[in-house]
Amino acid sequence: MEQAPNMAEPRGPVDHGVQIRFITEPVSGAEMGTLRRGGRRPAKDARASTYGVAVRVQGIAGQPFVVLNSGEKGGDSFGVQIKGASDQGASGALSSDSELPENPYSQVQGFPAPSQSSTSDEDPGAQWNGKLLRSQSQASLAGPGPVDPSNRSTSMLDLAPKVASPGSTIDTAPLSSVDSLINKFDGQLGGQARGRTGRRTRMLPPEQRKRSKSLDSRLPRDTLEERERQSTNHWNPSTKYNNHVGSLKQPAQSPSPSPLSGFSRARQTQDWVLQSFEEPRGRAQDPTMLQFKSTPDLLRDQQEAAPPGSVDHMKATIYGILREGSSESEASVRRKVSLVLEKMQPLGVISSGSSKAMAGQGELARKVEELQRKLDDEVKKRQKLEPSRAGLERQLEEKTEECSQLQELLERREGEAQQSSKELQNMKRLLDQGESLQHGLETQVMELQSKLKQVQGPEPAKELLLKDLLETRELLEEVLEGKQRVEEQLRLRERELTALKGALKEEVASRDQEVEHVRQQCQRDTEQLRKSMQDASQDHAVLEAERQKMSALVRGLQRELEETSEETGHWQSMFQKNKEELRATKQELLQLRMEKEEMEEELGEKIEALQRELEQARASAGDARQVEVLKKELRRAQEELEELQAERQSQEVAGRHRDRELEKQLAGLRVEADRGRELEEQNFQLQKTLQQLRHDCEEASKARGMAAEAEATVLGQRRGAVEAALRETQGDNDELRRRVLGLEQQLRETRGLVDGGEAAEARLRDKLQRLEADKQRLEEALNASQEEEGSLAAAKRALEARLEEAQRGLARLGQEQQTLTRALEEEGKQREALRRSKAELEEQKRLLDRTVDRLNEELEQIGEASKQALQQLQAQLEEYKEKARREVADAQRQAKDWASEAEKSSGGLNRLQDEIQRLRQALQACQAERDTAQLDKELLAQRLQGLEQEAENKKRSQDDRARQLKGLEEKVSRLEAELDEEKNTVELLTDRVNRGRDQVDQLRTELMQERSARQDLECDKISLERQNKDLKTRLASSEGFQKPSASLSQLESQNQLLQERLQAEEREKTVLQSTNRKLERKVKELSIQIEDERQHVNDQKDQLSLRVKAFFRQVDEAEEEIERLDSLRRKAQRELEEQHEVNGQLQARVKSLEKDSWRKASRSAAESALKHEGLSSDEEFDSVYDPSSIASLLTESNLQTSSC
């Protein structure tokens, strides 16, 4: 133990640490007190021998770590060695018994266990003072047999959790440092390879891989707990702990005490080792899947080898492979071995529980993915269904409203059915009462027959009766007076009864009429309902088609609205641009007007100048024709101006008239829209009136039931009164029994009455059967009507929705009409502005044409004047030539005459020659100027031709504009004609609507008549019922009357009357049915007309949309025309500028001509003066025809040609 630090010096610096080494023992075995040190054993020898594990806990720079080794490198030494920084032993490192791990090699008696030899890295001199005791084998450790505590050895895994005292604190910082070191080694291994890579990568077979499970820090907690349970089955942990303490106390007493630093370091390393053993307990796995063998303790005489697949075997093989041929230290090799094992353990320690957990995690991940997908799908569906949710909610609300309405209708129908059932029950009661009355009458007849038989009995009974009759005669005389009184009372009662009979007859007749009328109404209602069902089915199909059409129309209208919105935006921008352009044109027109005024002023000045020149020309030439021509042109110009003003006024009046007509048409369209709305309101009112009529019918049926009940009560009261009267009459009959003969006659009469009553009862039964059949039919009709009413309600809703859509469409049309009217007004205003601008431009053009004509005339006049001037100049030149010739001839003569004076005149001759040359040059220059004047004249002619062509082009453009204006006027006329047609159609629609109103009024009057007829029939029915009651009462009281024949005749006559009334009522019913059918046909025709009108309105909408498009196109054309007019205006401005330039040139020319005329006048005056004076001397000739004057004349001619 003392040489351990010296041995550790060549392996690097060691701060402190604990080394625990368990080494093998041969199979042959030696004595317990001796331990042999052998060399490195191969894997095969290790199988048959014991093995051990070396655990080194060292600190490198204060960071501890763990290295596990099989212990094959060193000798077969056993023991626990605690190393410190000093050279002292480890005895002082153990301060208490509970803080150190148990020494498995300590003896039981308490003597120290010596170590005969140590590993290569331990102190060879350290020895154990005791011997190892042999205990059970590895297989016996797991057995249930008891073991003596003195002969056993525990594993490190069993000791680790028991050594740590509750007072000691476990520091977790070394674990993080171990992980960091492992990561460092991983990085180093990834970058550099230490040792021999070939041997390091070599893998041994699983048979040779051994490991010590006593030091496996990666084992799960459950296996440890199982082993502890097995260990607790064998012995008590208190004895084990005591044995462990005793074994540790004995070797701790032999060496000398160490300082406190060594003790603290040893304690830290010991705590760290215990913590490393306790850490794997947190990583528990399934105990069933991880069944490892218990770690064998190094007991005495242990000869079994570790299994080939164990961790110790693997560690030993890896350590041997890494140790062979490597010069590294043992600590580094052990580090590498521990790292390799740590990396290999996850591969070998995967259990089925972890595989199940992984499979469960995979399934959970799949489920999570599926749920996430479902959630995404649901979110997408919700996002898709959110826009349709609002529509569905609206539909649900509509359906709920419809259901509520249907429930209300069902409740109403149920109430009506209950009322009809009550009426049927009342009728049944009345029938039962009639049958009971019939039975009573039959019993009365039977009693009367029995009495008659008794009266027709034997003769003694007759004699007794005769005696009784004689006795009664006396009594009768007394009773006659009372009888007369009674008869008077009876007469009064008969009168009352006749009145009641009449009332009953009327009631019965009215009741029968009501019943028949109700039956007919039911039949009509059923027929109407059938027809309405058929019509509803047809209407449903038509409505579906119309819905599709309306949807298509709505889509088209939406598209058109979008297009129109875009077009309106475009047009608004265009209108704004046009407004700006119009403003610019207005400004330009104002400028043009100013320029025009300036031009007019200039032209006035020019005209005044021309007039002055004309006056001068008149004074000079006296050309009166030109003045007249100018006057005529002025008159024509004034007339044209007046005509243009009149045309402009007429156009303005026509435009105002058209605007008024357009406003009227728009007002008519608005009136038509209002009429359409009124028609829709009237249709709605008609539907309301139909519903009211149905409601009135229902109330009438209820009133009938109530009236029947009231009549039944009244009849019961009357019957009670009649029964009381009958009782009184029976008392009278009892008193008048003696009148047998009258009774027989009365019996016969009563038999006849009974027969008639039976026939009446049979008739009543037939009527009741008919009524029941009618009732069944009515119930069926009611059911059908309910169904039809449901369908009609749906159709009505559809129609209402359709009407709302139509109203919306009409509102949209109204808005479109308003926009169109505004656009038309704006177009009218623009047209007026265009017309005004056009008129102004035309006026300007005419003025320009006139000015151009005037200028052309002036140019022609100037050309003629220039021609005349040229002719005059030519004549003057010829005269000059002739004069020169004459002068030359005179000079020659004078030369001949004055030869003597030749020398004197030589200088003059030279001068004359020079002058002749000059004159020749001047003549050449005049010819050149003449040529230039001709060229200028040709250029002027070309310019005039160009101006004429431009004037022709302007005329053509004006013609094109006139054509375009005519086309626009034709379009406007067409539009006016179309508006007239629309007015006519609107008038026709209004006529149709008025007719429909008249028909509706007629239908209302007819319905009122039918109601009155129904009331009459009800009254007749009531009277007939009263008559029937009277007849029944008469039948009941017929026993007490003496004259039944008259009553029978009256009854027969009444029956005949009733039959006639019934026939008349049937005829009236047929007539009413025919009228109802006619009314139904009329209603159908009206509905067809309304549908036609709707279609016509839709067609009108389409036509209006087309017209709107045409209007937009016309606006486009108008804009193009405006652009054209702008271009023409610009061209006119350019032409005006050119004409200004031409006018300036003409003014310069006129000025030059004025100067020339002035010079000509001065020359003519000079020539005349010369002729009068008759120049004779050469000096005067020289003075007159000096070169300066000739040059001035030539320069003036040049100026004239240049000005041209």
Curated annotation (Swiss-Prot):
Residues 247-261 have a biased composition (Low complexity). It comes from the Eukaryota. The keyword tRNA-binding does not apply. The modification N6-acetyllysine is found at residue 579. GO terms for molecular function: microtubule binding. Residues 54-67 are annotated as: Interaction with TJP1/ZO1. InterPro entries: Myosin_tail. Residues 1162-1204 are annotated as: Tail. GO terms for cellular component: bicellular tight junction; myosin complex. Residues 358-1161 form a coiled coil. Keywords: Acetylation, Cell junction, Coiled coil, Phosphoprotein, Tight junction. Residues 25-48, 68-174, 186-266, 379-398, 1161-1182 are annotated as: Disordered. Residues 7-357 are annotated as: Head. A motif (ZIM) lies at residues 48-62. GO terms for biological process: microtubule cytoskeleton organization. Its main location: other. Disulfide bonds: none annotated. Residues 93-119, 232-245 have a biased composition (Polar residues). The keyword Acetylation applies. Residues 207-231 have a biased composition (Basic and acidic residues). Belongs to the cingulin family. Deletion of the TJP1/ZO1 interaction motif (ZIM) decreases but does not abolish colocalization with TJP1/ZO1. PANTHER family: CINGULIN, CINGULIN-LIKE PROTEIN 1-RELATED. Homodimer. Interacts with TJP1/ZO1 and SPEF1. Probably plays a role in the formation and regulation of the tight junction (TJ) paracellular permeability barrier. This is Cingulin. It comes from Plecturocebus moloch.
